[in-house]
Regions:
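Structured mid-to-C-terminal alpha-helical surface segments
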Residues: 1-53, 65-69, 81-334
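Glycine-rich beta-strand-to-loop/alpha-helix junction loops that act as flexible
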Residues: 55-59
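Betabetaalpha-Me/HNH-type nuclease active-site subdomain
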Residues: 62
């Protein structure tokens, strides 16, 4: 991948455009996909903290496990909290609600300092060396736990930002995880251009991500009417729809104890009374949002369609499957 990153602009432009034509995707999306894979390869193989991070989230579902046909713009990373000075089990110690809240805030503050003072300056220097030019890397002003890599883009597209967001948090569970191979779209279609066409990345197991997504939908089903659902949240419904069509669903059902692990984690580190996480268990789990949410969710899904490829289901089809999945989960015997 490094050889492609340093190709003349005209060669990269031709590579990304030809790949996009073959896939029926926008040029800018194919280009960004390459830089996402390049960045992952650097982070997990050459970065000083390569042994202290785990890949998670929607991008892992598409790139690592080929479970969804959705282009994901961001890289979600779990940072081993031992990098921040905590012992392995320290965050799990029993505390009062007040003390736990203080601990959570302190852990997030430590992560922000680490990213600003160590991580960001280091990768800026190292990626500049790899690219042979100044790498544009900085902390997001609105989210201090997000590092932005403004990669050297040749194409633009209003549906996607020409930057990669590295969303890095220490308050996340990094098990179970497995090694997965990740390959840029361009390498799939033009493998001979690449000296190295794929990379091995430590990634959260999709069974856990299945239950993570299910608890997000439960959270949204309980969101107060006065509170708007965040933009692009329809992606979570689509992701769970697609995962439910794969063997991951049965694997997740066979490991239903993972759901409790996910719920316990969220209740400890991301508590929110109205989310009713204690009800996110077989028998009472909610995936389907209230009727009054559906129009806004359908509009959000329509706005996200540019990020989907292959056989794109209708919103109605997605919600029908989600409704059936809710019934299936609630019929699981504990």
């Amino acid at each position: 991948m490094r050889n492609v990153a340093r190709l003349p602009e005209s060669d990269r432009r031709e590579l990304f455009r030809n790949t996009a034509d073959k896939m029926g995707l926008n040029d800018a999306i194919v280009e960004k996909d390459f830089w996402v894979c390049f960045t992952l390869d650097y982070l997990f193989h050459r970065c000083p903290w390569k042994g202290a991070i785990t890949f998670k989230g929607g991008t892992s579902l598409s790139k690592a496990f080929n479970l969804i046909s959705r282009f994901s713009e961001d890289i979600d990373l779990i940072l081993d909290w031992r990098v921040l000075g905590y012992s392995k089990d320290e965050p799990w110690e029993k505390r009062s609600n007040t003390k736990q809240d203080a601990f959570n805030k302190e852990a997030n503050a430590r992560a922000e300092v680490f990213l600003a003072e160590q991580f960001c300056p280091t990768i800026q220097v190292e990626l500049s060396q790899e690219l042979g030019c100044e790498a544009n890397i900085y902390i997001d002003e609105k989210d201090k736990q997000t590092v932005i890599f403004a990669y050297p883009h040749l194409f633009t597209n209003s549906a996607t930002l020409q930057v990669i967001r590295l969303e890095i948090g220490a308050l996340a569970a990094w098990t179970p995880a497995k090694i997965a191979q990740i390959e840029p779209y361009a390498a799939t279609y033009y493998p001979k251009v690449f000296a190295q066409k794929d990379t091995a990345i430590l990634t959260v197991a999709p069974e856990r991500t299945f239950w993570e997504k299910a608890t997000i939908l439960h959270h949204e089903a309980n969101r107060p009417e006065s509170s708007e659902m965040p933009q692009r949240y329809s992606r979570h419904y689509y992701d769970l729809y697609r995962m439910s069509m794969t063997p991951v669903k049965e694997a997740a059902f066979a490991q239903v104890e993972l759901l409790k692990t996910v719920v316990d984690f969220k209740m400890k580190f991301y508590p929110r009374a109205w989310a009713k996480y204690q009800e996110a268990t077989p028998g009472t789990l909610k995936l389907v949002p209230p009727e009054y949410r559906l129009d806004a969710l359908a509009e959000d899904y329509a706005n996200m369609r540019d990020m989907l490829y292959g056989n794109i289901p209708s919103f109605e089809e997605v919600m029908k499957v989600i409704q059936n999945l809710e019934k299936e989960i609630n019929s699981i015997k504990k």
